[in-house]
């Protein structure tokens, strides 16, 4: 009994490992991304580190990297040949040339006989992309339409449009939709003549100082006309069409992602990968279950 009491006291006295909440990460389409997985405060030496990816809620989970922590090697990453995911020497997950299909939830786990860090670091990765179009107002003046969208679709209320270090100058209108934001720029009234001839750089900024830069062509009209309000169907129809196309593209990309994950799951039905759980399982002693017999069932 004394040995059992000391064992329970030792287990209960172990400090809890601190962990961060789910982190939202933005990456621009085509850029690289590194997802860290730092070492936990305590390890037994028999843990295996794994990285998992779930592209959408309710979809199958894919194992993208698996290595034993106690046996470091020169090339610990073992990604698939067609994959652009690589496990670095510090156990971070490196994504090269991000695509829309790379969006989703990533998490690393360290599982052993004594310690089980099942959801040690969790990231929600969104891929940011931009598009640029031209529109013509009712009076014939040319307007620029800038579109920022994310996959998977999420609210973009925190997106800001900037020109240099300040707000965008001129006659501008911004619109927000599900997973997309749009900026309509028409030649402004009262701008100095040099400003009207210089090309501008407009940035769509999301949290973490990530963003997309748009280059506007120099204006050739010395006296730009004010963009007419929505008195004609030209600009309004183009805005509606762009928002519809953006949402349709998001739906198609998510459908392709789900189809690919189901196809991969059918090829690995015998493999069982742990699904993501919102709670964090930290320390677990598998020998504790053998210390006392199970309680008898009562009716």
Curated annotation (Swiss-Prot):
InterPro entries attached to this UniProt entry: Ig-like_dom (IPR007110), Ig-like_dom_sf (IPR036179), Ig-like_fold (IPR013783), Ig_sub (IPR003599), Ig_V-set (IPR013106), LY6G6d/LY6G6f (IPR026524)
A GO cellular-component term linked to this record: plasma membrane
Keywords: Cell membrane, Disulfide bond, Glycoprotein, Immunoglobulin domain, Membrane, Phosphoprotein, Signal, Transmembrane, Transmembrane helix
Membrane-spanning residues: 238-258
Role: May play a role in the downstream signal transduction pathways involving GRB2 and GRB7.
Quaternary structure annotation from Swiss-Prot or TrEMBL: Homodimer; disulfide-linked. Interacts with GRB2 and GRB7 in a phosphorylation-dependent manner.
UniProt protein name: Lymphocyte antigen 6 complex locus protein G6f
Highest classification ranks of the organism: Eukaryota, Metazoa, Chordata, Craniata, Vertebrata
């Amino acid at each position: 009994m004394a040995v059992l009491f000391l064992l329970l006291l030792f287990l209960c006295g172990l400090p809890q490992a601190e962990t961060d909440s789910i982190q939202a990460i933005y990456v621009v389409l085509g850029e690289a991304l590194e997802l860290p997985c730092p070492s936990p405060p305590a390890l037994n030496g028999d843990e295996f580190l794994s990285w998992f990816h779930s592209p959408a809620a309710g979809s199958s989970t894919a194992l993208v990297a698996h290595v034993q922590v106690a046996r470091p090697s020169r090339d610990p990453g073992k990604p698939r040949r067609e994959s652009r995911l690589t496990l670095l020497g510090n156990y971070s997950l490196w994504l090269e040339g991000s695509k829309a299909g790379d969006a989703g939830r990533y998490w690393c786990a360290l599982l052993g006989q004594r310690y089980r860090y099942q959801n040690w670091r969790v990231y929600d990765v969104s891929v940011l992309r931009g598009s640029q179009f031209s529109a013509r107002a009712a009076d014939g003046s040319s307007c620029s339409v800038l579109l920022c969208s994310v996959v998977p679709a999420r609210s973009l209320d925190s997106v800001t449009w900037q020109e240099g270090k300040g707000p965008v100058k001129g006659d501008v209108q911004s619109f927000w939709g599900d997973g997309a934001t749009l900026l309509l720029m028409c030649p402004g009234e009262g701008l100095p003549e040099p400003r009207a001839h210089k090309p501008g750089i407009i940035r769509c900024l999301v949290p973490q100082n990530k963003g997309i830069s748009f280059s506007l062509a120099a204006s050739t009209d010395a006296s730009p006309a004010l963009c007419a309000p929505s008195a004609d169907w030209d600009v309004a129809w183009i805005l509606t069409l762009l928002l519809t196309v953006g949402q349709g593209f998001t739906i198609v990309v998510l459908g392709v992602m789900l189809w690919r994950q189901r196809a991969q799951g059918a090829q690995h039905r015998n493999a069982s990968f742990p699904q993501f759980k919102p709670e964090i399982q930290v320390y677990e002693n598998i020998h504790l279950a053998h210390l006392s017999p199970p309680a008898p069932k009562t009716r």
